[in-house]
Amino acid sequence: MENTAQAVKSKIEVKNLNFYYGKFHAIRNVNMSIRENKVTAFIGPSGCGKSTLLRTFNRMFELYPGQRAEGEILLDGENLLTSKTDISLIRAKVGMVFQKPTPFPMSIYDNIAFGVRLFERLSKGEMDERVEWALSKAALWNEVKDKIHQSGNSLSGGQQQRLCIARGVAIKPEVLLLDEPCSALDPISTAKIEELIAELKHEYTVVIVTHNMQQAARCSDYTAYMYLGELMEFGATDQIFVKPARKETEDYITGRFG
């Protein structure tokens, strides 16, 4: 795996990462390289630390008291965990979509425009173009173009999640984090999200947390298996699912554990 992986540029380098909820040591000495324009999946049983790890990539944990990260997370060589790094710039470069669709209580149009207005000064025409572009990227434009000024909450669950993805890409980030984006969706909506992920990786580096191992196998280029806060195995998805190096990984993937 490493020979193949090294041919692909690393977008995010994680070095000696430890994470704490108060005194609880939740992530232990994680080292990994997230490849550019690839999909990386984090798998593992509930409570293993995969969502916690994901949220260190844009310092989302800082919204909650008592949580802290130690080590380095390098985005194109810049350590995101230093106090010198502007948190607003991190959030502009690293977008995030959560498990439950979370449209803002405003129109579909304003859901997309909201984040853009924080970082850019666009004319009305430019904003209209950006909104259409983002909704098109999320394969949603044709479904909502005639009701763009209706509430985002009027959409179905699957449409709401694609709206959140459109909102994430509207600010043109470099990395998109997806925290179990399909867990609350029906199979048809899930299939649309998976198709969307395959398209998004051509322009973004995508990291997805999923409990669905079939989804990880279908969608990702690389897979990380975590257990009790430790990175047990990380490699090309084909290798992880067909010939894992560790018995613990095989036991989890085959359903004998977890």
Curated annotation (Swiss-Prot):
Family per record: Belongs to the ABC transporter superfamily. Phosphate importer (TC 3.A.1.7) family.
Q: Write out the GO MF terms.
A: ATP binding; ATP hydrolysis activity; ATPase-coupled phosphate ion transmembrane transporter activity
The broad enzyme category this protein falls into is translocase
Compartment(s): Cell inner membrane
Q: Where does ATP bind?
A: 44-51
Q: What is one Gene Ontology biological process annotated in the Swiss-Prot or TrEMBL record?
A: phosphate ion transmembrane transport
Which Gene3D superfamilies does the UniProt entry name for this protein? P-loop containing nucleotide triphosphate hydrolases
Family matches, as InterPro entries: AAA+_ATPase, ABC_transporter-like_ATP-bd, ABC_transporter-like_CS, P-loop_NTPase, PstB-like
Keywords in UniProt for this one?
Answer: ATP-binding, Cell inner membrane, Cell membrane, Membrane, Nucleotide-binding, Phosphate transport, Translocase, Transport
For this entry, the protein name equals Phosphate import ATP-binding protein PstB
- Topology in the lipid bilayer: Peripheral membrane protein
Chief subcellular location? membrane
The reactions it catalyses are: phosphate(out) + ATP + H2O = ADP + 2 phosphate(in) + H(+)
Recorded GO cellular component terms are:
plasma membrane
Which species is the source of this protein? Bordetella avium (strain 197N)
